[in-house]
Amino acid sequence: VAASFLSMTFRLPEPTDDDYALSMNHTNPTPFRFAPLRRASFRLSVTQAGQLPPDDGAEVAIAGRSNVGKSSTINMLTERRALARVSRTPGRTQAINVFDLDPGQRLIDLPGYGYAKVPEALRRSWGPLLEQYLRRRSSLRALILVMDIRHPYGPHDADLIGFAAGCGRPVHVLLNKADKLSRGAALQEMARLRRMPELQGVAMQLFSAQTGQGLDELHQLIAGWLAPGEQKETPTSAGVNNEPSKGGEDS
């Protein structure tokens, strides 16, 4: 992430009781699914801003440090076990990957960052690309930032949140791998993060790309960003395959 991120300051609205409810209520008996996510298809990989699709419609981007479960999150969202490749090699995502949903709707997979073994030249190329994307992309509605709840909020996360918010981009944090902690411990960790001055007003929720915890709430948020005012709920059934992707940790 470009060094200029460090110079940005930001302030987002204070969390509401509804924000807390989103993280608490992960056993909704009537699951919500934003249907276009099930129709996701890979479109292209981008290494230069000029290669991005036309800047129209609406898109949501997903970012995160290497190894936090970003690809597994995309696969869980789309109910496609191999849509985003899950790799045993951190930092595998080396470009912006574009997935088409319904016409005019896109899901954007941003490069994983913060892994020390990624070549320096590659890291330097990511910074300007991410900076241009976040600063100039008018169709970008929100940034979903995936964190490992066991090791959340590092310096790179702080840089990205500050820069995105400084560009006027809503940021929503997924505290992934919440299933690795007890419910009480996960809630305590989220409360600790909410108390951090630099995270005041940053929306966040508990999530698990393995169990689907928090999935309904995330579908509702994405529906609101990509199709405001439209009813896109579809029923789910026990036959839907939400098994985790095979393989190791992902970028």
Question: Where are the regions a protein language model picked out?
Answer:
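Conserved nucleotide-binding/hydrolysis micro-motifs of P-loop NTPases
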Residues: 47, 92, 105, 112-114, ...
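Canonical P-loop GTPase G-domain recognition
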Residues: 37-47, 180-233
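Positively charged N-terminal leader segments that act as targeting/secretion signals
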Residues: 2, 231-243
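Short, positively charged and aromatic/hydrophobic N-terminal segments
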Residues: 9, 16-20
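Conserved G1/Walker A P-loop phosphate-binding module
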Residues: 20, 25-115, 242
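Conserved C-terminal guanine-recognition region of P-loop GTPase G domains, centered on the G4
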Residues: 131-202
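Switch II of P-loop NTPase G domains
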Residues: 52, 92-97, 111-141, 149-163
